[in-house]
């Protein structure tokens, strides 16, 4: 198990001190008004200089940002774009300190650190946020969206408005906005998966998220919930036969070197990573600073969405070149076979009204 580094940031705010000039003895009787004026001006100048010297420190903000991405993943590049944009917009008064590759812990741990203000921000999926606001569970149910454009239309529009009612904030978090992560696909070491029946009996690793677990339990897989940081070891030691992740993660973590021979393009769920900040940190920013963070997040979002989509075919070709057997599947078959997962998600979410409201959003964005 990787040794995890707990990151806690203390921002130092220097107090402006006024420099005052004072004499040791009684003023001479011959002091003139001009001399007093000169002394007062010197004192005022000293005070002004002291305030100017300490002001930048008082305004300085550091954002410690944790995420899970490997060095070459789109999320890593997007995080760097966020950093450069924040620092550019703020004129250097705001800086971003990035810790990738789960250096600060897994998604659950990073969200917990963010919620208590130990770090300022993290990039986590809806499957992590649903522990704080259950409605996020609906976003990654199987086969909800016809494609990327519909997914973006839902999470950027009606869903964002719906969950912007303070529930997440009451748990110490604020979602600045969804970026992207992609549609998830299946890999395994045992056999080519062409149909839902081919999954039966395979030991499949998923995150500890009801949406993912239910998808593969509905296909008859032996689902093992294992942290991503332990995935490569589990695959190499054959603790599990396979796993499911977006193509960028499969490629950039070289899963063909971890006994993964077969790739099935199931595209069973879509999800994004969300720039999630500590709500207390967010409330402590000025309106202008929040604007910098929001604008930088939007820039990173747009970059990541473009990269995720444009690189899909490239990833598929590279995975094939690396020796993986790539299989297109009939997604309608998988959609039908995974239908029971909807019942599990609905039971977990707990509100038929929420489910109906969410599906109405999806239907409206399909028009």
Predicted regions, residues:
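Bacterial N-terminal signal peptides that target proteins for export
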Residues: 1-10
């Amino acid at each position: 198990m990787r040794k995890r580094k707990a990151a806690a940031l203390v921002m130092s705010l220097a107090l402006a001190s006024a420099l005052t000039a004072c004499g040791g003895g009684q003023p001479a009787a011959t002091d003139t008004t001009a001399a007093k004026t000169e002394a007062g001006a010197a004192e005022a100048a000293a005070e002004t200089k002291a305030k100017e010297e300490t002001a930048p420190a008082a305004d300085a903000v550091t954002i410690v940002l944790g995420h899970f991405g490997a060095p070459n993943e789109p999320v890593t590049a997007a995080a760097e774009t966020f950093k450069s944009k924040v620092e550019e917009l703020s004129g250097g008064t705001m800086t971003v300190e990035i810790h990738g590759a789960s250096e600060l812990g897994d998604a659950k741990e990073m969200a917990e650190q963010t919620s208590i203000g130990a770090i300022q921000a993290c990039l986590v999926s809806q499957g992590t946020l649903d522990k704080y606001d259950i409605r996020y569970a609906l976003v990654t149910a199987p086969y909800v969206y016809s494609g990327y454009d519909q997914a973006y239309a839902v999470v950027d529009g009606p869903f964002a408005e719906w969950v912007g009612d303070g529930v997440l904030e009451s748990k110490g978090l604020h979602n600045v906005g969804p970026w992207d992560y992609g549609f998830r696909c299946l890999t395994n070491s045992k056999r080519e998966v062409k149909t839902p029946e081919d999954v039966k009996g395979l030991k499949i690793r998923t995150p500890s998220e009801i949406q993912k677990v239910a998808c593969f339990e509905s296909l008859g897989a032996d689902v093992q919930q294992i942290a991503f940081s332990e995935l490569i070891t589990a695959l190499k030691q054959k603790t599990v036969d396979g796993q499911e992740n977006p193509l960028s993660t499969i490629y950039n973590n070289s899963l063909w070197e971890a006994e993964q021979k077969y790739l099935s393009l199931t595209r069973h769920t879509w999800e994004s990573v969300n720039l999630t900040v500590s709500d207390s940190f967010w409330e402590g920013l000025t309106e202008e600073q929040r604007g910098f963070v929001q604008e930088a997040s939007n820039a990173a979002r747009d970059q990541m969405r473009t990269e995720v989509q444009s690189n899909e075919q490239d990833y598929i070709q590279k995975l094939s070149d690396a020796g993986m057997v790539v299989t297109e599947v009939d997604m309608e078959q998988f959609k039908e076979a995974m239908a029971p997962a909807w019942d599990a998600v609905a039971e977990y979410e707990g509100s038929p009204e929420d489910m109906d409201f969410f599906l109405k959003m999806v239907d409206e964005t399909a028009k």
